[in-house]
């Protein structure tokens, strides 16, 4: 159960960020203790509004291609029926983009006014065609002009600048056409499909994602076109959170208009794990006030995504009234992961903080009730029993900030008041200002319902991404065993600790080359006992190899009925018949000495 490291520091050909070690020098929000929703341009997508003072819009995506008109129309209407505010349809070819004409005719003939967005990769010609028929078109800066996604050959500083000119040359006419037709554009960067020139310049980093978006956004600014939505997606919530934060700061730094954000975590998976991973990433950004429209990407029927997204928005509503913590600015860099340095302190004989991974505990009274500890690494006594120091509200934190010596060194601090994220950040700021390295315990008492489960995942996901938290205790969720497992699952969802097999799986779309929901179930059943590995399950190659960069092994659609197996980012077995692919994956894992019998 080792901690999972971040994907490394930004690499160093060039940086506009100047180190970015202090939040106050490069802020993404005005106040990290009292977030308010970011004030943005309002984008019109048909009858829908994104950003400004509009409610956060929920969207989803069909699993069909536009050429299959009947199924595409049926899925669009089904999504609209459950409250989806915008439906996205992939158009992988020019012919598919042409098919959008008939899809839109039938959707509107059915009395459905939900706006539609086309999703385009590799095909600028298809993007131009899609503008004729739908209200919004998403393009991917990783492959709109640059299509050499996985090659870094012949990349130089000169070729990088020449590439920027090519982007302007190719993208400007598209922006002009969108402006003429009254359409909206999403500049949708994916961590898994950065252009080769961006990888050359910045590495496989958050900075590369941000600069990819900024390059295309500069074209929109030059054309005085502001009907733009931005997204920076990754399958790693920690990467996604840092990327959106940095983009908000960069837009402000550059003096661009504040464009709205489409927030999501790609390849979240299915079931409870998919929901927790989505909450850890999307929820953290909702709590930062950075989301204007969201999509929860589950490897399930698209209509299942909508109620989860709606519940997540409800769970992560921002407080109406600010809290007065009266502590110094929380300067910790929000763009580069580094766990807060702490001294080791023991709770019930178990070391918390220091070099130990984030520990999972259980309330001692809960163990007494059930007689079962179930994987908990320590038993938490009363919250007011040494070495625990409980702060219940902003006044407690402010009092400590004024007189930190009143609390003995070697304590474990715990905030149990409202708004866990802002409270723990304020606590950390007070500790840092006092030169204290006492550990912090993240404690949450929740009820057994989806809203509170999503919220606690968002809270903990946000805090561990900030490098805060040395132990986690969830109290009140079903029972002691379930509370402990939920805590471990949230830490895994937030890429903090791995306690079971990690599955990275994309939602199905029109590019998917096999029944991914069925295959996902089979792979989970076959490999779910391998707690020390990560497996990517991807429908196609558009984002697959890149988005599963964290995975040890990958199962990727390589063609109709054919699968390519990956080890890391390297394709090691190609053109495998789908019916043989799972056993071939077993053999590959055995060959690498990582197989264990269930």
Which residues are covered by each model-predicted region?
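N-terminal active-site wall of soluble small-molecule enzyme domains
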Residues: 91-133, 367-370
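Catalytic alpha/beta core domains of metabolic enzymes, predominantly
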Residues: 155-171, 176, 198-342, 347, ...
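Short, acidic/polar
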Residues: 67-78, 122-127, 278-282, 369, ...
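Hydrophobic or amphipathic alpha-helical targeting/insertion segments
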Residues: 113-151, 157-177, 182
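Glycine-rich, proline-tolerant flexible connector loops at the mouths of alpha/beta enzymes
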Residues: 63, 81-107, 141-162, 228-237, ...
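Active-site mouth loops of central-metabolism enzymes
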Residues: 53-71, 116-123, 198-210, 266-276, ...
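N-terminal amphipathic alpha-helix/helix-capping segment at the start of soluble metabolic enzymes
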Residues: 21-60, 175, 179, 318-365, ...
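Hydrophobic faces of well-ordered beta-strands that scaffold small-molecule active sites
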Residues: 56-62, 87-89, 116-120, 137-139, ...
């Amino acid at each position: 159960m080792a901690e999972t490291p971040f994907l490394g520091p930004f690499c160093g050909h060039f940086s506009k960020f100047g180190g970015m070690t202090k939040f106050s020098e490069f802020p993404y929000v005005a106040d990290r203790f009292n977030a308010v929703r970011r004030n943005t341009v309002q984008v019109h997508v048909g009858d829908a509004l994104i950003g400004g003072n509009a409610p956060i819009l929920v969207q989803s995506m069909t699993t069909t291609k536009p050429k299959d008109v009947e199924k595409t129309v049926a899925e669009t209407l089904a999504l609209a029926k459950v409250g989806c505010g915008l439906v996205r349809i992939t158009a992988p070819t020019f012919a598919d983009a042409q098919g959008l004409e008939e899809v839109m005719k039938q959707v509107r003939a059915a009395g459905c006014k939900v706006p539609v967005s086309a999703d385009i990769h590799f095909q600028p010609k298809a993007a131009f065609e899609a503008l004729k028929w739908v209200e919004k078109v998403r393009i991917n800066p990783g492959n709109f002009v640059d299509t050499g996604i996985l090659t870094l050959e012949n990349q130089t500083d000169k070729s990088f600048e020449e590439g920027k000119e090519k982007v302007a040359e190719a993208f400007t006419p598209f922006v002009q056409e969108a402006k003429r037709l009254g359409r909206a554009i999403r500049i949708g960067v994916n961590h898994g499909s950065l252009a080769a020139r961006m990888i050359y310049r910045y590495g496989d980093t958050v900075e590369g994602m941000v600069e990819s978006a900024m390059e295309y956004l500069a074209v929109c600014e030059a054309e005085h076109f502001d009907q733009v939505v931005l997204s920076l997606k990754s399958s790693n919530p920690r990467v996604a959170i840092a990327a959106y934060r940095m983009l908000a700061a960069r837009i402000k730094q550059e003096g661009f208009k504040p464009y709205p954000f489409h927030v999501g975590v790609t390849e979240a998976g299915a079931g409870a794990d998919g929901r927790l991973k989505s909450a850890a990433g999307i929820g953290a950004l909702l709590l930062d006030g950075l989301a204007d429209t969201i999509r929860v990407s589950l490897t399930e029927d698209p209509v299942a995504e909508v109620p989860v997204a709606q519940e997540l928005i409800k769970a992560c509503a921002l407080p109406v009234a600010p809290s007065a913590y009266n502590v110094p600015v929380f300067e910790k860099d929000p763009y580069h992961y580094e766990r807060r340095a702490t001294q080791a302190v023991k709770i019930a004989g178990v070391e918390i903080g220091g070099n130990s991974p984030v520990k999972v505990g259980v309330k001692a009274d809960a163990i007494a009730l059930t007689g079962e500890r179930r994987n908990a690494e320590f038993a938490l006594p009363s919250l007011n029993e040494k070495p625990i120091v409980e702060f219940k509200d902003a006044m407690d934190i402010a009092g400590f900030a004024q007189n930190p010596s009143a609390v003995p060194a070697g304590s474990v601090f715990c905030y149990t008041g409202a708004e866990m994220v802002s409270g723990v950040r304020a606590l950390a700021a007070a500790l840092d200002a006092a030169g204290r390295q006492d550990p912090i315990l993240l404690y949450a008492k929740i009820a057994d319902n989806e809203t509170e489960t999503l919220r606690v995942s968002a809270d903990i996901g946000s805090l561990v991404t900030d490098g805060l938290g040395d132990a986690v205790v969830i109290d009140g969720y079903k029972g002691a065993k379930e509370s402990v497992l939920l805590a471990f699952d949230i830490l895994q969802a937030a890429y903090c600790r791995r306690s079971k097999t990690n599955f990275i799986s994309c939602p199905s779309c029109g590019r998917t080359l096999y029944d991914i929901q069925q295959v996902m179930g089979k792979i989970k059943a076959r490999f779910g006992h391998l707690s020390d590995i990560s497996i990517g399950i991807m429908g196609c190659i558009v984002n697959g190899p890149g988005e599963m960069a964290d995975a040890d092994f990958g199962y990727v659609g390589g063609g109709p009925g054919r699968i390519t197996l990956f080890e890391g980012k390297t394709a090691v077995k190609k053109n495998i018949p789908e019916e043989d692919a799972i056993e071939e994956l077993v053999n590959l894992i055995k060959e690498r000495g990582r197989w264990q019998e269930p």
